[in-house]
From Swiss-Prot:
One of its GO terms (cellular component) is cytoplasm. The lineage of its organism: Bacteria, Pseudomonadati, Pseudomonadota, Gammaproteobacteria, Pseudomonadales. This is 3-hydroxydecanoyl-[acyl-carrier-protein] dehydratase. Belongs to the thioester dehydratase family. FabA subfamily. Its EC number is 4.2.1.59, 5.3.3.14.
Length: 171
């Protein structure tokens, strides 16, 4: 079977309902926390480390929920949502690889914010570069990522870590 290498909004919504990788496996959050509209490219090869990459996008409109509350009179997308989107994509990569279990963010190394997403922006692009995938008792991916708005890089994160767990009871 050939793996799919791009995913639409509807595909991602299916993933949020647990329908893409099967029950109990990697699942994206539902809207409003789903911070991705499409994955334009996903591969087991390529990226900075030759171990896989993802490119995904979020369309920006002034009526997105977070602009109304962060901050009143000074609307800006919270940086933590961009960071969470990168974790979402690393977890998606694990599910796409066929690794069983529910995804959980496990941390990151250095995170830098040097720009912002305003309501006037059109598109956020996420670039994820897989550094390592551990398979065994613990299934986990480690990646570096970046967030760009309208073609300008504004956040970076090193050492994004996400694991998938068949039981999260004792997590």
């Amino acid at each position: 079977m050939t793996k799919q290498h791009a995913f639409t909004r509807e595909d991602l919504l299916r993933c949020s309902r647990g329908e893409l990788f099967g029950p109990g496996n990697a699942q994206l959050p539902a809207p409003n926390m789903l911070m991705v509209d499409r994955i334009t490219h996903i591969s087991e090869e390529g990226g900075k480390y030759g171990k896989g990459e993802l490119v995904a996008e979020l369309d920006i409109t002034p009526d997105l929920w977070f602009f109304a509350c962060h901050f009143e009179g000074d609307p800006v997308m919270p940086g933590c949502l961009g960071l969470d989107a990168m974790w979402q994509l690393v977890g998606f990569f694990l599910g796409w690889q066929g690794l069983p279990g529910r995804g959980r963010a496990l941390g990151s190394g250095e995170v830098k914010f040097f720009g912002q997403v305003l309501p006037s922006a059109k598109k956020v692009t996420y670039n994820i570069h897989i550094k390592r995938v551990l398979k065994g008792k613990l299934n986990m991916a480690i990646a570096d990522g970046s967030v760009s708005v309208d073609g300008r890089e504004i956040y970076t994160a090193e050492g994004l870590r996400v694991g998938v767990f068949t039981s999260t009871d004792n997590f």
